[in-house]
From Swiss-Prot:
Homotetramer. 4-nitrophenol 2-monooxygenase complex consists of an oxygenase component NphA1 and a flavin reductase component NphA2. Partially inhibited by concentrations of FAD above 10 uM and completely inhibited by concentrations above 50 uM. The gene is nphA1. Belongs to the FADH(2)-utilizing monooxygenase family. PANTHER family: 4-HYDROXYPHENYLACETATE 3-MONOOXYGENASE-RELATED. Its EC number is 1.14.13.29. Gene3D superfamilies: 4-hydroxybutyryl-coa dehydratase, domain 1 (1.10.3140.10), Butyryl-CoA Dehydrogenase, subunit A, domain 2 (2.40.110.10), Butyryl-CoA Dehydrogenase, subunit A, domain 3 (1.20.140.10). Signal peptide: none annotated. Its cofactor is FAD. This is 4-nitrophenol 2-monooxygenase, oxygenase component. Keywords: FAD, Flavoprotein, NAD, Oxidoreductase.
Length: 519
């Protein structure tokens, strides 16, 4: 992926650069990238059975941008002056209305994939959309930030990120594990030569580029890096985990694994073997900027905003499936089942409400920009790791063995020796045909019971941070803004209205005339 083929650097000058179509996106992946799977290098991720339908699910999202009915929802005018259009979340938000527009666009795109692509192309707009207003944060690399803001917005490049170090020697600082963590090994006129590894490079096999930063404290300059790297960069390698998409194709059909077979964001180990990062792709090369990235770049509030809207869509989908499921099993009228379905809807409503609150109670930021409300975002980040596992548990409780009282394969339905028995003994309640019951319950099993489903629970539990950090960082955020003082002051106000001698408020009547014990 050579970004220069997509862009015109002149700000405010009309050009022909537009967001990719689905076909253009797929073609952009045919660039010779080094992706390894099952002991072999993948020639073309768009045709390999481990990645091809997941790539086509993303292509479907790009095609949606070009549908006339999406104008004003998924497609709005750019702010670069090129005369093009873009997804609203790739632009600087300057009002609550802008954030609502961004939220609605995130939702519209996620409805194309039923909420199952956590790292969709607009996920990294959480970062890219900050660069226009916050370019000064990157100091000497300010112009790089502005250029990437323009490029990413006009072409809507698909970036992922990898900011976590491999879980090796976690008791040591990153800059004491030079054989593992990403660092500069050489400076050249052309750029920085970088080696090391990053995880978890979710979906990176089918992205145009990756964004690399760091989470945690750094002390040595050579580790203080923030940069982007095209996926076809020489020396950049991806070692992919097993493919749920390919496993689904081998073991079943889309009828058997309707989610695994098309929405698998393959996670990978990303290795840099003396990769050249051109200076124009560098955002920071110092520890102060790298250490301040999470709290000062604007990314934190926005990635939580994207995640909350996405999860709300996912829960819409899951709630609909579960309600249909209990109808098919005949338990929809049971009081206990109704209670638990109500709880799923409570979780669904909470995340929709948090996405509303994040958008409609924005915080002023830099250069006239606004950010989604941080406190509501932090609440989402805590409760996503509680709510999603709970929803999964409810599904297992209310549907029970129905999730596995299923025949093995779609081909069973074509076997005349089997079909009459399946139709009789595997049918649903209320006149639901066996094949329709099995179709729905296999969908739910893929959501919660397969390896794909297990990976999604792990993702929702952890992608926003570990279970301790997401909670204590909420406290730290309150302390940083003085909101903790306001809350303690509220408690102190109550305590100031009385003392050991009685009421201190003049409007309240003392009780000396009623006391049994008198001093």
């Amino acid at each position: 992926m050579t970004t220069s083929a997509f862009v015109d650097d002149r700000v405010g000058v009309p050009n022909d650069v537009r967001p990719m179509t689905g076909d253009e996106y797929l073609e952009s992946l045919r660039d010779g990238r080094e992706v390894y799977f099952r002991g072999e290098r993948v020639d073309d991720v768009t045709t390999h059975p481990a990645f091809r339908n997941s790539a086509r699910s993303v292509a479907r999202m790009y095609d949606a941008l070009h549908q006339p009915e999406q104008e004003g929802v998924l497609a709005v005018p750019t702010d670069t002056g090129n005369g093009g259009f873009t997804h609203p979340f790739f632009k600087t938000a300057r009002s609550a209305d802008d954030l609502v527009l961004s939220r609605d666009a995130i939702v519209a795109w996620q409805r194309e994939v039923y909420g199952w692509l956590g790292r969709s192309p607009d996920y990294k707009a959480s970062f890219l959309g900050t660069l226009g207003a916050n370019a000064d944060f990157y100091g000497p690399y300010r112009d790089n930030a502005l250029r990437w803001y323009k490029h990413a917005q006009e072409r809507m490049l698909y970036l992922n990120h990898a900011i976590v170090n491999p879980p090796i020697d976690r008791d040591k600082p990153a800059d004491e594990t030079a054989d593992v963590c990403v660092h500069v090994v050489e400076e050249t006129d052309a750029g920085l030569i970088v080696s090391g590894a990053k995880v978890v490079a979710t979906g990176s096999a089918i992205t145009n580029a990756n964004f690399i930063a760091h989470y945690g404290l750094l002390r040595k300059k050579e580790y203080g890096l923030i940069f982007t790297v095209p996926m076809d960069s020489p020396g950049l390698k991806l070692f992919c985990r097993t493919s749920y998409e390919m496993n689904a194709a081998v073991m079943g059909t889309p009828f058997d694994y309707p989610l695994s077979s098309r929405f698998d964001e393959n996670d990978a180990i990303m290795v840099f073997d003396r990769v050249l990062v051109p200076w124009e792709n560098v955002f920071a090369y110092d520890t102060d900027t790298a250490n301040g990235f999470v709290m000062k770049s604007g990314f934190l509030s926005r990635f939580m905003f994207h995640g909350c809207a996405r999860l709300a869509v996912k829960l819409d989908f899951i709630a609909g499936c579960v309600m249909k499921g209990v109808e098919m099993t005949g338990s929809a009228g049971f009081r206990g089942v109704q209670m638990q379905i109500g709880e799923i809807l409570n979780w669904r409503d909470m995340f929709w409400g948090l996405s509303d609150a994040m958008a409609k109670s924005p915080e002023q930021w830099v250069n006239g920009a606004v950010q989604p409300n941080l406190n509501y975002g932090l609440a989402y980040r805590t409760f996503m790791g509680v709510g999603y596992p709970r929803v999964k548990e409810i599904i297992q409780q209310v549907l029970g063995s129905g999730l596995i009282y299923l025949n093995s394969h779609a081909s069973d339905w074509a076997n005349p020796a089997m079909r009459p028995y399946l139709d009789q003994y595997v049918r649903g309640s209320n006149g639901v045909a066996a094949i329709d019951r099995v179709q729905l319950l296999k969908l739910l099993w893929d959501a919660v019971g397969t390896e794909f489903g297990g990976r999604h629970e792990l993702y929702e539990r952890n992608y926003g941070g570990d279970h301790e950090a997401v909670r204590f960082q909420t406290l730290f955020a309150y302390q940083a803004t003085g909101q903790d003082l306001a809350l303690k002051g509220f408690a102190e106000q109550c305590m100031s209205e009385y003392d050991v001698d009685g009421w201190t408020r003049p409007d309240l009547i003392g009780n000396d005339d009623l006391r049994i014990v008198r001093g």
